[in-house]
């Protein structure tokens, strides 16, 4: 398990764009499972939406990517590098994510050619899928 201090050593993301709080399982270069505690203090809730706060879907996708980035950046050849989105495929949002929810995010590498790869990812709240899809990335 990796706490926030270890996560900050691995990925380059920082507040307010760090969207993973803990890694609870990881296989270097293959898969990771992480947690995002969603609180009303998140800056995006000020405008999305003030009377009905909902986590923006694009930030759920970003959280999934950051969990995957932890697994990939543990590989020796990628340590200290920066992961970039190259695309997203088959992403579906199934339920809204609200303050107080705990996102449990799982990512698994599907393919990797050099520094370009694809992963499948799923985000769940209380065991129910809220978002799933495929993430394409490049590591530079």
UniProtKB/Swiss-Prot annotation:
Active site: 48
Keywords: Cytoplasm, Lipid A biosynthesis, Lipid biosynthesis, Lipid metabolism, Lyase
CDD domains (UniProt xref): FabZ
KW RNA-binding (keyword) present: no
Location in the cell: Cytoplasm
UniProt cross-references to InterPro entries, sorted A to Z: FabA_FabZ (IPR013114), FabZ (IPR010084), HotDog_dom_sf (IPR029069)
Enzyme Commission number(s) of this protein: 4.2.1.59
Superkingdom of the organism of origin: Bacteria
Record carries keyword Lipid metabolism: yes
GO biological process: fatty acid biosynthetic process; lipid A biosynthetic process
Alphabetized GO MF terms: (3R)-hydroxyacyl-[acyl-carrier-protein] dehydratase activity
Any single GO CC term annotated in Swiss-Prot or TrEMBL for this entry: membrane
Catalyzed chemical reaction(s): a (3R)-hydroxyacyl-[ACP] = a (2E)-enoyl-[ACP] + H2O
General function of this protein: Involved in unsaturated fatty acids biosynthesis. Catalyzes the dehydration of short chain beta-hydroxyacyl-ACPs and long chain saturated and unsaturated beta-hydroxyacyl-ACPs.
NCBIfam families according to UniProt: fabZ (TIGR01750), PRK00006.1 (NF000582)
Family assignment from sequence similarity: Belongs to the thioester dehydratase family. FabZ subfamily.
Protein name: 3-hydroxyacyl-[acyl-carrier-protein] dehydratase FabZ
Organism taxonomic ancestry: Bacteria, Bacillati, Bacillota, Bacillota incertae sedis, Caldicellulosiruptorales
Gene: fabZ
């Amino acid at each position: 398990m990796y706490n926030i201090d270890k996560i900050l050593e691995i990925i380059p993301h920082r507040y307010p764009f760090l969207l993973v709080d803990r890694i609870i399982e990881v296989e270097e270069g293959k898969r990771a499972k992480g947690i995002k505690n969603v609180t009303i203090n998140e800056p995006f809730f000020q405008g999305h939406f003030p009377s009905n706060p909902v986590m923006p879907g694009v930030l759920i996708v970003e959280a999934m990517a950051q969990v995957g980035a932890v697994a990939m950046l543990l590989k020796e050849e990628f340590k200290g590098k920066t992961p970039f989105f190259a695309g997203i495929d088959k992403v579906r949002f199934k339920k809204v994510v609200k303050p107080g929810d705990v996102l449990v995010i799982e990512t698994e590498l599907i393919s990797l050619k050099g520094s370009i790869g694809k992963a499948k990812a799923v985000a769940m709240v209380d065991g129910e899928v809220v978002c799933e899809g495929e993430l394409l990335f490049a590591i530079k």
